[in-house]
């Protein structure tokens, strides 16, 4: 059993899957700045060069000869409270920045030279070829983040783990909403196995681009079945479910079922997992097919009020996307 990479259901707010983009930057001569948002871990290709020099899997600026420092501004796809920060300098050994700082702001418009940025991490040492991790204890939400490196160099990845804070007043109580959406605040709390693919893609927008763009378990050689637990972005009444096996052909699950629960009190992830086998069944065990979108209407007689759901697949395999649709209940 795994609890979402020890992040307790937090999402990477800097992920392109969230809609995060680079708004502006000072320089990316050696390595395109967008590379540092890549969800995949950085790689090193020894003999790969381009017109600017050694190809590096990350953002890398040229050597500064004029003083000052380099920077990049991220526009987060969803505003959120940042709890954990990872500045990954993997494979940057003689060319990593010795210091960095991080600032944030919440603004309905793009920041400018007069914007009042809040310091998240003051100027701090970085270690080369390393995942540099930091924790924050802030309650403010941000939708723009500025990474500054001193004076120049390369950053393989930036990851900002936190909780989406969406303005649910934008929806009325009769609208059908994708309650599981990553961008709205849906998150993966735990799963028993995720050997292949990208588990966070399960709640992402659009259809999977490849077989690697989804949740896939290893081949099960023992009795039982695989499962994953998801916290919905908002408590709601579930009315429709979509299970998409795009690109999974010889390795899609034979069957699937879904259970749900509505929890109003604080509960540990461990207790949640232990109780999940006894949650209400809202989708009985049903056959799946390869490379296909499966849609299910939830019977109004079912107990479909939920804050969390558990997807069971039998016995194993891959699911590209899971979408839970319904009407919101309590506003956050």
Q: Whereabouts are the PLM-identified features?
A:
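Structured core elements
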Residues: 229-231, 242, 310
């Amino acid at each position: 059993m795994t609890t979402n990479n020890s992040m307790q259901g937090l999402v990477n707010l800097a992920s392109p899957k969230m809609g995060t983009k680079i708004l502006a930057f000072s320089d990316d001569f050696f390595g395109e700045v967008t590379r540092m948002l890549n969800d995949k871990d950085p790689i090193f290709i020894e003999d790969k060069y381009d017109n600017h020099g050694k190809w590096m899997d990350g953002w890398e600026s040229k050597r500064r000869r004029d003083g000052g420092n380099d920077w990049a501004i991220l526009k987060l796809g969803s505003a959120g409270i940042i709890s954990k920060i990872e500045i990954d300098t993997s494979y940057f050994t003689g060319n990593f920045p010795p210091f960095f700082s991080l600032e944030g702001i919440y603004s309905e418009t793009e920041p400018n030279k007069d914007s009042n940025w809040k310091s998240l991490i003051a100027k701090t040492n970085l270690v080369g070829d390393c995942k540099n991790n930091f924790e924050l204890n802030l309650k403010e939400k941000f939708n723009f983040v500025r990474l500054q490196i001193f004076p120049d160099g390369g950053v393989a990845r930036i990851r900002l783990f936190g909780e989406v804070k969406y303005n649910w007043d934008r929806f009325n109580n009769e609208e059908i909403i994708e309650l599981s959406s990553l961008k709205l605040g849906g998150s993966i709390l735990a799963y028993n196995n995720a050997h292949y693919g990208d588990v966070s893609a399960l709640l992402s927008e659009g259809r999977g681009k490849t077989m690697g763009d989804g949740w896939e378990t290893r081949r099960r050689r023992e009795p039982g079945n695989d499962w994953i637990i998801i916290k919905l972005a908002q408590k709601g009444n579930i009315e429709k479910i979509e299970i998409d096996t795009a690109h999974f052909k010889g390795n899609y699950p034979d069957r699937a079922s879904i259970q749900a629960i509505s929890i109003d009190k604080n509960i540990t992830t461990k207790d949640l997992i232990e109780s999940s086998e006894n949650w209400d069944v809202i989708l009985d065990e049903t056959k799946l097919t390869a490379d296909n979108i499966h849609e299910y209407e939830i019977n109004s007689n079912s107990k479909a009020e939920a804050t969390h759901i558990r997807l069971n697949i039998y016995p194993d395999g891959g699911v590209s996307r899971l979408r839970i649709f319904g009407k919101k209940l309590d506003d956050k």
